[in-house]
Regions:
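S-adenosyl-L-methionine-dependent methyltransferase catalytic module, highlighting the catalytic core
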Residues: 130-131, 139-252
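Conserved SAM-binding site of S-adenosyl-L-methionine-dependent methyltransferases, i.e.
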Residues: 135
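Conserved N-terminal segment of class I S-adenosyl-L-methionine
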Residues: 1-125, 132, 230, 241-253
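A structural helix-start
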Residues: 90, 138-139
């Protein structure tokens, strides 16, 4: 075990990282919640491995809201030509850089950036776009989904908590004119999460949590040619198994 791994193992993390020596990091979240990450990774692989297996060395990926870089590392270890992880919090990027050093992955880089203010032209397009655990923390999740689409060359995976849907109509200027709702956003107060420690919420204290119908409709309207809900595997993390969280794949065909 080298000095970098010793530094990594001296603290607790959001993820269980299995380091090159075989040592595994401790987590500061409850173990029953930490299981979400292995389910996410398995669902990610179930979509991406059939598409890019055998061609990873020609494939590029960006991980938006990468946190400590868990999924960025999973893609870099598959042999991606280039993986870029972006997160708004500098402390997350510092942690991700330390983890990257422990793995020694030259095809992986991290940078600080706010997805809600991001100009896709700055980095170009990627074969794979990940956006896990982000949009339900945002004031403007639609803008984030548009950014994700602009960055996507082949496939984008969105993972999110979802709100209940409402099948209804809205009066539109007169009682004689109505429009059907195509999806719902629930308003959530994240003030305590934002001002607590460790910070896992978004950068604002108001969050809009979408219904599944909203995610599917907006991704199609944003320009994805095909949008599919990724089925959870057996023994999934309970929220994904119950459909309270989902991974949605958006394709550019």
């Amino acid at each position: 075990m080298n000095e970098i791994e010793k530094r990594v193992l001296s603290t607790k993390w959001f993820y269980h990282f299995k380091l090159p020596s075989g040592a595994v990091t401790e987590v500061y979240i409850p173990e029953e919640i930490a299981g979400i990450h292995s389910t996410r990774e398995q669902m990610m692989g179930n979509v991406l491995d059939p598409l890019f297996g055998g061609r990873w060395s020609e494939t590029t990926a960006v991980d938006l809201a990468c946190h400590e870089g868990y999924f960025s590392i999973a893609l870099a270890q598959r042999g991606c030509k280039r993986v870029l992880g972006i997160d708004a919090r500098e402390e997350h990027i510092r942690d991700a850089e330390l983890i990257r050093s422990a793995y020694g992955l030259p095809n992986l880089e991290f940078r600080t950036g706010d997805v809600t203010k991001f100009d896709p032209a700055e980095v170009g397009q990627f074969d794979i776009v990940l956006m896990f655990g982000l949009i339900y923390h945002l004031e403007n999740p639609i803008a984030a989904l548009r950014v994700a689409h602009a960055l996507t060359r082949r496939v984008c995976l969105i993972e999110t908590q979802i709100a209940p849907n409402l099948d209804a109509t809205v009066e539109w200027g007169s009682q004689h004119f109505v429009k059907p709702t195509v999806g719902v956003f629930a308003v959530v107060d994240e003030w305590e999460d934002l001002h607590g420690a460790p910070k896992q919420a978004g950068l604002a204290d108001i969050a809009l949590v979408p219904s599944l119908e909203a995610v599917l409709w907006i991704m199609k309207r944003a320009g994805f040619t095909r949008v599919e809900v990724v089925p959870p595997p057996p023994d999934s993390y309970e929220q994904l198994a119950r459909g309270q969280r989902v991974i949605v794949a958006g394709y550019i065909d």
